[in-house]
A protein has these predicted regions:
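Active-site alpha-helix of zinc metalloproteases
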Residues: 8, 96, 100
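Central hydrophobic cores of alpha-helical transmembrane segments
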Residues: 174-187
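Perimembrane helix-loop junctions in membrane proteins
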Residues: 77, 81, 124, 128-132, ...
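Short helix-to-coil transition segments within interhelical loops
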Residues: 88-94
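Transmembrane helix boundary and interhelical loop/hinge segments in multi-pass membrane proteins
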Residues: 51-54, 70-88
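Hydrophobic alpha-helical transmembrane segments
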Residues: 1-61, 65-66, 73, 146-150, 168, 176-179, 217-221, ...
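Secretory targeting signals
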Residues: 37-67, 99-176
């Protein structure tokens, strides 16, 4: 398959999911309402009154779960919309079809991460403007954002491929493995909070002096290799075991 066809498949999956989920009016409204509520909380209870700006970073713990669900939705949609027969019989290899969905899900994930951290940064700057730079240590804030972003990007391919595999297994002869995959999803999604607990356990000043240990950097390539193996498993199931 040439590059132009792959771009078409990628663009199709990306735009379809964008219209079905990201561009819905209720998503925009909920996002605006949430930001306004958090801004109000920072204004009333911010910093010395108990609600430190750095606590907002813990909202990122939901992102690994959302990452999995993005890729799960991209593939499971073919069954829900009744288009699995059309999609799977397209004159392209199963690996190309799954790779296009993986890339579309990855782009959606990057979009979510950008919106999330952009929104949190606006809230942090607002809190600093209200309470002063001495009360809101922005250096620690940006350090925490960078650490969390590295962990999220490091584990994202693993969660994305696990989402595709789970969707494929759900409608295959291996459906009995579905509960096990959902357990793996729960454990993998909790990795960020587990790592944050380790990093902050001996940091009384929170994220200000936290740093990623070497073993996390070393684990990221291994996670990406494992993601490649999981994607290969999903391709095999879609090619030989899927029911439609």
């Amino acid at each position: 398959m040439n590059a132009s066809v792959f771009r078409y498949l990628l663009r199709h999956d990306f735009r379809l999911e964008l219209r079905k989920f990201f561009l819905k009016k209720w998503m925009v409204r909920y996002g605006v309402i949430l930001i306004l509520l958090l801004a109000a909380a920072l204004t009333i209870w911010g910093e010395g009154r108990g609600f430190r700006t750095q606590y907002l970073l813990f909202l990122s713990f939901m992102l690994p779960y959302l990452t999995f669900m993005i890729s799960f939705r991209v593939l499971i949609r073919e069954w829900k919309d009744g288009t699995i027969g059309w999609w799977i019989t397209l004159p392209y290899s199963r690996s190309s079809l799954l790779l296009a969905k993986f890339c579309a899900a990855a782009l959606h994930t990057l979009l979510v991460y950008a919106l999330f951290f952009g929104g949190l940064t606006i809230l942090a700057l607002y809190s600093a403007a209200v309470h002063g730079l001495e009360a809101v240590p922005l250096q620690g804030w940006f350090n925490g954002e960078a650490i969390i972003a590295v962990i999220l990007l490091g584990q994202a391919p693993l969660l994305l491929t696990l989402g595709l595999l789970t969707a494929a297994v759900t409608h295959s002869r291996w459906v009995a493995l579905t509960p096990l995959l959902w357990v793996l999803f729960g454990v993998s999604g909790n990795t960020l909070s587990w790592m944050a607990g380790i990093l902050l356990s001996d940091q009384p000043e929170g994220w200000a002096n936290a740093a990623l240990p070497g073993w996390i950097w070393a684990a990221i390539p291994g996670a990406w290799v494992l993601a490649g193996l999981i994607l290969a498993g999903a391709i095999h199931i879609v090619s030989r075991q899927v029911r439609f």
